[in-house]
Design a protein with these regions (language model features):
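Short alpha-helical elements
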Residues: 1-234
Length: 234
């Protein structure tokens, strides 16, 4: 039984460190070990997410007041850089912890993407190439009928609002392509998606191999339409 915030932090650290020891060989980086270990940094990020500390300035400010739990709190620039470098590991650990907490057992989810523009369209020709180096490019956002330069954040979210998985992809990457890769890592779910995820082949593969049912809102010209009570889910 976890009765306090301190106990929750300890439990989270033990879980994160156990998982990290198993997967850390996949994320080796050059240089000396940091004063704040990767396990500590990942734990601070996960606990901060649980507490709703959405901004890094708020998260780090709170941890600086709790140096009894984490004595070495990195600067914001260093924390941000290391957190981005560990993004894949963070997501793997996050999914494992969610399963341990049994918070993701709803079984019904929604998949969608949202645009993350990084440079205004008309300013792209004169901008530096830094964003392009990190994967940003041009892509269309059909729902808003616009073109952006940047990324799309693809999310798998429980109907209760819990983020189960995410992928930050170039703006040009199709929802169906990224969604297929993301859903292939999950099983035993019913997933609702918009028209961007329509694919009979993908739906069949996920059902056969992952026991995952992908339900999409049909296009108006499709013969098979959803019943009204199910359409309201979208």
């Amino acid at each position: 039984m976890i009765d306090s915030f301190d106990e929750f932090c300890l439990w989270m650290y033990v879980m994160v460190d156990d998982i990290w020891q198993q997967i850390s060989p996949l994320f080796q980086r050059p240089g000396p070990a940091a004063a704040c270990s990767d396990s500590e940094l990942l734990t601070m990020a996960l606990v901060g997410e649980c507490r709703g500390w959405a901004e890094e300035t708020v998260l780090l400010s709170n941890w600086r007041e709790r140096r009894d739990l984490f004595p070495c709190v990195p600067s914001q620039s260093r924390f941000n850089r290391r957190r981005r470098a560990l993004m894949t590991a963070f997501n793997l650990i996050r999914q494992t912890v969610l399963r341990l907490l049994d918070l993701s057992a709803d079984g019904q989810c929604a998949i969608d993407s949202l645009p993350v523009p990084v440079v205004k369209f008309h300013l792209v020709p004169g901008s530096t190439g830094d964003w392009a180096t990190h994967g940003a490019d041009f892509g269309k956002v059909a729902s808003k009928k616009l073109t952006i330069f940047g990324f799309k954040l693809h999310l798998l979210v429980s109907l209760g609002g819990l983020i189960l998985d995410f992928v930050l992809a170039p703006a040009s990457a199709a929802d169906l392509t990224v969604g297929a890769e993301m859903l292939a890592e999950h099983t035993d779910l019913t997933v609702f998606g918009d028209k961007g995820y329509i694919s009979v082949d993908l739906a069949g593969q996920l059902l056969r191999h992952n026991r995952l049912k992908l339900l999409t809102l049909p296009r108006r010209n499709q013969h098979c339409q959803l019943p009204p009570e199910l359409s309201h889910t979208f």
